């Protein structure tokens, strides 16, 4: 599949950024306006923040500045992710990055004053409903504050600290070139996006195998550069952890999530130990149904029933999304239904585009979603996942101050994966045919849980080993990273999948390693979304409670938020319940196969 240029796609498949700014000039004017407001704020409050009343007034004005920064920050990076080869987009991104650095430096005096404030002042500010999250975070920072000069220097170095991720992202979008491959006498084009979104799920074994080898060879050419970028990332995080007096880099990276190391380790350890046998059982069943004597890493994304993997249009996907979210009620449906008419989503699978997907949240404008549409059902899962994030953004933004709107990273993936469960539930109940039901349950596993409970969880297990190396004063290169990834994959998959040296390059496929301890939160969020889904199925207040969770934003801690839907994540019960739910799902799938004589 050869990728088209962005100009070849119809307007309806491209997002409309004019809800933010009309054009580049409008964007640049917004930057100048924000600079003026920041300068005035500095003149008014620098050296004048002492009392509760001082801070209360300053917070009100600072919120308006942060909202401007939210709009500028989102607009600056989004265009470039649609085409990394576009110089105009690169210039917009640089202008936004320069502004963000300058603004952050100019406003450090406020953070310095806040963490230096008396506990009594912080306690009174924390009692204000619109500042609960900001003050919780301030108290966390206060315990590890390095002083005004050092903190300002670190802020000035923000762009430098971001460089490893920037290098990796641009390398993945612009430098990863996959050679053409031949299968059954036919030549196929390959790329990062087409492999990830199309070939790895292909029903033909030779296409899967040959595309995987082409894909892996393309990765291998850049493994040393990728390893160097990743080493720079983790060494800088370790340096900051030590400077700030944390016991370990793990404690430093988990602090702002408001969870402890035990919750991080529990997520990885229980899934590696108790969910791995469930996943192995399912893949062995897939191999049996598809007549495979062995399953390689090129095969593990194979659909259980490839013949029932229909092409889906963007228009059909809209209907699927809206029908799936109906159980959440009119209030939710009316908000997310806007995504089509207002063109929130950038669907075009054009050359130079970021291969991933994301949802962006310019505060109280409307969300934006980036993805690459290839017409497979997995794309519908990606879409409804990002619409899940979007729904949370809308409800949090509408019901919380800017300071309280952002969920903890620990469970930020709950709203997105919850929507995936609604899609699978809708598909499952569209027919009494065992083949159709098996199809829906299989996609529940492969498109939701395998992605979040396996792909991202194994990233987290890999990360834990890498950070442990750094904690012990060691270093690494590409060879060591390949070895660690191969070890993690082998531990999880056992004899269900043949793990080779190409599989060991999997660490090169995700940008999550540049986002701290983010990967494990996909499974943590999915535990909360599973609890919410089961609560929706079994409680009359399930939909209302879920919307209340979305509306709470970051106003509560992760433990408090999960209790809104009755999930006590201080224990391992929600995680064990989720694993049991998945084991039951595999049993159902195998039972349907037996009914079909397979």
Give residue ranges: language-model regions.
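Post-HExxH zinc-binding segment in Zn-dependent metallohydrolases
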Residues: 407-436, 445-447, 451, 525
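Active-site recognition of the HExxH zinc-binding catalytic motif
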Residues: 245, 374-394, 416, 421, ...
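A well-structured
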Residues: 1-306, 318, 591-598
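Long, K/E/R/D-enriched contiguous segments that form extended
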Residues: 288-327, 333, 392, 439-441, ...
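Conserved helix-loop functional segments at active or binding sites
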Residues: 323-334, 360, 389, 393-401, ...
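Catalytic zinc-binding patch centered on the HExxH motif and its immediate surroundings
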Residues: 307-312, 345-365
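C-terminal, non-catalytic "cap/extension" segments appended to globular domains
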Residues: 8-11, 22, 110, 114-115, ...
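Short pre-active-site segment immediately N-terminal to the catalytic Zn-binding motif
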Residues: 309-314, 362-384
């Amino acid at each position: 599949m050869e990728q088209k240029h962005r100009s070849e796609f119809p307007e309806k498949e491209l997002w409309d950024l004019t809800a933010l700014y009309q054009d580049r000039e409008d964007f640049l004017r917004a930057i100048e306006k924000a600079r003026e407001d920041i300068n005035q704020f500095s003149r008014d409050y620098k050296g004048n923040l002492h009392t509760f009343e001082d801070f209360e007034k300053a917070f009100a004005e600072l919120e308006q500045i942060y909202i401007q920064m939210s709009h500028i920050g989102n607009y600056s990076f989004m265009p470039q992710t649609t085409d990394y080869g576009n110089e105009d987009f690169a210039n917009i991104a640089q202008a936004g990055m320069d502004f963000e650095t300058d603004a952050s430096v100019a406003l450090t005096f406020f953070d310095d004053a806040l963490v230096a404030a008396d506990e009594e002042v912080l306690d009174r500010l924390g009692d204000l409903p619109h500042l609960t999250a900001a003050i919780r975070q301030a108290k966390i920072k206060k315990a590890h504050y390095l002083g005004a000069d050092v903190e300002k220097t670190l802020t000035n170095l923000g762009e430098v600290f971001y460089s490893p991720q920037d290098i990796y992202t641009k390398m993945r979008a612009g430098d990863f070139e996959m050679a053409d491959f031949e299968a059954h006498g036919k030549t196929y084009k390959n790329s990062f996006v087409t492999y990830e979104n199309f070939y790895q799920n292909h029903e033909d074994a030779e296409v899967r195998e040959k595309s995987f080898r082409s894909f892996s060879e393309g990765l291998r050419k850049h493994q040393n550069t990728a390893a160097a970028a990743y080493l720079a990332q983790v060494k800088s995080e370790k340096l900051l952890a030590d400077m700030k007096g944390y016991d370990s880099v793990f404690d430093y990276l988990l602090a702002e999530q408001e969870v402890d190391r035990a919750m991080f380790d529990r997520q990885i350890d229980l899934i590696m130990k108790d969910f791995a046998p469930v996943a192995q059982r399912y893949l062995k069943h897939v191999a049996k149904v598809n007549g495979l004597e062995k399953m390689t890493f090129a095969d593990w994304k194979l659909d259980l029933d490839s013949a029932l993997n229909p092409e889906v249009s963007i228009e059909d996907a809209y209907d699927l999304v809206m029908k799936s979210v109906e159980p959440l009620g009119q209030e939710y449906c009316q908000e997310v239904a806007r995504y089509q008419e207002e063109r929130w989503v950038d669907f075009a699978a054009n050359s130079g585009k970021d291969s991933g997907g994301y949802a962006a949240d310019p505060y109280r404008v409307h969300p934006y979603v980036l993805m690459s549409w290839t017409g497979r059902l997995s794309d519908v899962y990606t879409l409804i996942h990002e619409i899940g994030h979007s729904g949370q953004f809308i409800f949090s933004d509408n019901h919380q101050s800017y300071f309280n709107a952002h969920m903890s990273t620990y469970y930020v993936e709950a709203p997105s994966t919850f929507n995936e469960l609604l899609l699978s539930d809708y598909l499952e109940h569209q027919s009494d045919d065992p083949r159709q039901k098996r199809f829906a349950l299989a996609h529940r596993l492969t498109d939701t849980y395998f992605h979040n409970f396996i792909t991202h969880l194994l990233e987290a297990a890999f990360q834990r080993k890498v950070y442990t190396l750094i904690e012990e004063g060691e270093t690494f290169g590409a060879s060591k990273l390949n070895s660690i990834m191969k070890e993690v994959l082998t531990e999880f998959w056992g004899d269900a999948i043949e793990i080779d040296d190409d599989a060991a390059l999997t660490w090169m496929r995700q940008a999550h390693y540049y986002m701290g301890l983010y990967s494990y939160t996909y499974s943590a969020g999915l535990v909360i979304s599973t609890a919410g889904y089961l609560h929706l199925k079994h409680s009359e207040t399930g939909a209302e409670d879920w919307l209340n969770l979305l509306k709470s934003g970051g106003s509560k801690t992760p433990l408090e938020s999960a209790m809104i839907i009755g999930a006590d994540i201080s224990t391992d019960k929600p995680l064990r319940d989720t694993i049991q739910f998945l084991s039951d799902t595999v049993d159902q799938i195998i039972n349907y196969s037996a009914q079909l004589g397979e």
